[in-house]
Amino acid sequence: MGFQFQNQPLWKRYRSEFPVTERLIYLNHAAVSPLPRRVARAMKDFADDACEFGSMHYDTWLAACEGVRLAGARLIGSHRDEIALVKNTSEGICAIAGGLDWKPGDRVVAFREEFPANYYPWKRLESRRVQVEWLSATDPLDRIEEACRGAKLLALSFVQYLSGLRECKGHR
């Protein structure tokens, strides 16, 4: 059975992880997406363990988190100490916006059409005299490159919130 699974096209293997596709054509992946079967199973296993044993297996849970950090580090070619696990993208963006050592005159480049969680944290920095250069997702690459010179941070989504457009700005 596993061999047959491996011979399926990649999209079919992924699709089989999402039971919602058996009932719906699901297109709303912008903020809250359906859980893959394996994620739902892992969450259930964790909840059952916590329910039945309390914190007795806390060391195992921490080891699992460290394994995820290590896998993430390998994936992007970094060290696991550079990987933080957060609940969601919004929490991560807020942690970065609130956690960096911002000084008056520091510059951020951001986009007006962003999802609110990637807009308001940078907008809020303006009150701390951080300069935010607001661009449009339709600006040409040269304009974006120019704006990024000397900037401390570029806040850019891979998939555009309003249009769903997946930009490959770095590819020419």
Predicted regions: what they are:
Residues 1-172:
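Pyridoxal 5′-phosphate
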